[in-house]
């Protein structure tokens, strides 16, 4: 493999990592801040992809982004209503919505399982036209993905410091304290899940426009990928402020995609990639714990040696 091919693989991994990092940031909000494990991520990601694809095929690539985010917001709203108004466990609520979204996504696609955007204008082609004749013309995909990730990081950094953002963080830490402060945790949970759903759908929309196709399985395994990326980011940068943790989520997504790309280049069978994802998740979860246990193991070994 020559050097240009290596750089091409790295750039593709960066682009895909930045696009998927938007989903990781959504999981950061719902899982890390709200302490809610939303298993509707896969279906919501596909919802954003197919909604954005259908809207872009109608000739509105920019409107496709907002349509996808609106669809994701509705998905998050339904998940939160099932949890807060109907007393359904968060895990079960996510599974129910994820199951329902499969039928909804097929309906949006008009009964098809694949939508092609080969002859459709996308936000990436718009960026390419905007940068035509500039030194950055060849990096239009990377710049578009970077802009999306940067905007979401900036939004979360500012939003989580507002009154509502602080209430969302408090809800995840101690719901009883939030109730005693005359704040309805159902409202904060709903707001948080709606925002997370819109981010997940945005990520799906961007990926569909990036690869110029949307299929019914585009979001399969996305919750696993996002969780692994989130844990990798927290391992790399550790625990810090909101901005640092959000940046860590983005870095984790890029690292995961790089590892995934290497696995593909090693001619690994496609059916083994899910196993690779599972192994990465296990390592991302266990490494922080093993770090804390390492001094204990060393002390035990020293005692045995003595």
Go through each PLM region and give its residues:
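Single transmembrane alpha-helix segments in multi-pass membrane proteins
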Residues: 7-61, 81-87, 231-243
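Loop-to-transmembrane alpha-helix initiation sites
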Residues: 16, 90-92, 141-146, 218-225, ...
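Membrane-interface helix caps of multi-pass small-molecule transporters
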Residues: 29, 54, 77, 81-86, ...
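Alpha-helical transmembrane segments within multi-pass membrane transporters and channels
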Residues: 60-99, 104, 252, 256
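Helix-loop-helix "hairpin" substructures at the membrane interface of multi-pass membrane proteins
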Residues: 75, 138-218, 223
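Transmembrane helix-bundle core of multi-pass membrane transporters
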Residues: 90, 94, 101-161, 191, ...
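Cytosolic-side transmembrane-helix boundaries in multi-pass membrane proteins
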Residues: 173-180, 184-187, 259-306
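Transmembrane alpha-helical segments in multi-pass inner-membrane proteins
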Residues: 200, 204-275
């Amino acid at each position: 493999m020559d050097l240009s091919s290596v750089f091409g693989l790295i750039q593709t991994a960066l682009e895909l990592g930045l696009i998927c990092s938007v989903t990781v940031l959504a999981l950061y909000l719902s899982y890390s801040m709200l302490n809610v494990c939303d298993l509707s991520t896969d279906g919501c990601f596909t919802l954003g992809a197919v909604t954005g694809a259908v809207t872009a095929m109608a000739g509105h690539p920019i409107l496709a982004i907002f349509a996808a985010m609106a669809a994701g917001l509705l998905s998050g709203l339904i998940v939160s209503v099932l949890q807060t108004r109907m007393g359904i466990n968060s895990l079960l609520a996510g599974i129910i919505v994820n199951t329902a979204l499969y039928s909804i996504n097929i309906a949006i696609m008009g009964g098809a399982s694949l939508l092609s955007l080969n002859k459709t204008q996308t936000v990436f082609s718009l960026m390419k036209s905007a940068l035509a004749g500039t030194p950055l013309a060849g990096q239009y995909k990377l710049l578009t993905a970077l802009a999306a990730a940067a905007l979401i990081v900036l939004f979360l950094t500012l939003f989580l410091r507002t009154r509502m953002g602080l209430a969302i963080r408090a809800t995840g830490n101690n719901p009883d304290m939030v109730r005693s402060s005359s704040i309805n945790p159902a409202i904060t949970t709903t707001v948080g899940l709606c925002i997370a759903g819109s981010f997940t759908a945005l990520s799906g929309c961007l990926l569909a426009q990036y690869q110029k196709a949307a299929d019914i399985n585009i979001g399969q395994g996305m919750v696993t990928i996002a969780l692994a990326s989130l844990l990798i980011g927290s391992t790399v940068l550790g625990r810090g402020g909101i901005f640092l943790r959000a940046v860590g989520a983005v870095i984790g997504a890029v690292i995961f995609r790089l590892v995934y790309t290497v696995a593909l280049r090693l001619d690994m069978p496609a059916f083994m990639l899910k196993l690779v994802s599972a192994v990465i998740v296990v390592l991302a979860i266990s490494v922080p714990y093993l770090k804390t246990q390492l001094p204990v193991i060393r002390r035990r070994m020293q005692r045995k040696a003595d």
